Amino acid sequence: MSQQQPWWNGAVIYQLIVRSYRDGNGDGIGDLQGLASRLPYLRWLGVEAIWLTPIYPSPLDDGGYDITDFKAIHPDLGDLAAFHRFLTAAHSQGLKVVMDLVMNHTSTLHPWFQRARWAPQGSPERDIYVWSDDPHRYADAPVLFRHFESSNWEWDEVAGQYFLHRFLRHQPDLNYANPFVQEAMLDVVDFWIDRGVDGFRLDAVPFLCEEEGSRCEGLPETHAFLKRLRQRVDSHGRDILLLGEAIQPVDEIAPYLLQDELHGAYNFALTAHLFAAIASGSVDNLRNCLEEAQQVVSGCRWALPLRNHDELWLGDGHLIPEEVIQIIRAGLHQGQGHWLNWGINRRLAPLLNGDPGSNRVLHALLYSLPGMPCLYYGDELGMGDWPGLRDRDPNRTPMAWTPARNGGFSTAPDPLLVLPPITSPGYDYRVVNVEVQKQLPGSLLNWHRRMLTCRRLLPALRYGDFELLKCAHPGVISYVRCDGSMTVLVAANLSAAGASLHLDLSRWSGVRTREVFWGCEYPPASEDWFVYLPAHGFSWWLIGEVEDVSSD
């Protein structure tokens, strides 16, 4: 690109849970010291940024998203000095660090809430949270954690009032109508930027403000605060990412991506449509979703996850149509019996029944669509999960590094481990781990590394324009990414049967066409260009004469 791009434009983001990644001091809990020791692996893999789920002090009733201090590190994970050492090491490896910032709520054990519940009604201390005498206020706001909560309100005996909690009852919502709350959260952002972080993943960003008669999502007051947040971030004078988690349809996310608000947002609707395409073998809904996303917000501002630390969120018919939800529930048989809240509580590989073809074709799309691909730790290995653990813990088990005890995660005795390592058939850590897969040229890990290497060497896949191509086959999606003189053609078969394609490449008629990964020559582009894709097969092709990028 002739114009300097911010670091996050098209960057591959690797999400990890510090307490489940690597134990550096032998106490059974992953920590910043252990994570720092694995930074060379992340550099080797080819990711460009690390998203840390919350590392703040917390009673851990919701995996650290219930925070008691926004300006400290949980003692299990280290301290601010350990964070500084980790951040310095990450930057020395060329890796950016994105913090998870939970702006919507705190823990009930946060000092703010403890003062609020004892303070008199109408006092500044009480007003830091949202209180009511009526538990039926904001009745149109859906209960998000419907398997755990029956209401968005919880009675507090000390306060003599109900407090609002859009999440769990131990996570009271902050009151963003209070200027103190806004200034306090902006001060938290300043604190971490001053320590060198490169961005923030903004948790639950639509729910900051409330209004009677609405779903209490994405209200004008919320956008007004996000504009203030963007101004504060920009005032630091360097590229700092603001990435919003808004589980909403793409047309409702668009206002967050105005030039004076967030830099990017997750496209969870696209995630759902990718799984629906695999489940049904049809790409019609996926094509429509991609077209809508690019019409609403063009370019590479969408963050693209397949899985993360939560359930695969499908929603109540608001995020995606009910018929698409039913396609996923009926087609992904390994998700049956694992429904949690509004989604499926399984890791990627088990959800796909361990099928490597489905796994690879979904990631091939993820790495070639416009946006910021998000890779959840362990998915590069095809790690399994532990159904039966509480809440979302089945998806948050320790990273498998070696065939040694505990998968090389920790030397601690089994009872001290933060969670048990995977030992289920087909996913046992003694087989599915980094050390073993590094030695196997055809492993999923080495495949991911090769894909990320090719993506890094092909600017069209990171920055390029996106255009869907017409394709008569109902199970195949095809598109081109173009950046200057470079054009990359992508075709992916989401069906469980082979597909013969005839693509119209007449605009490149007679131009050389080569497959990216192995450099294989294909017939020159033509008006009726033929290619065969096996079941769940895909390919990337370079169109035209460019530098050879097939070797690494």
Report the location of each language-model feature.
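Active-site and adjacent substrate-binding regions of carbohydrate-active enzymes
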Residues: 1-552
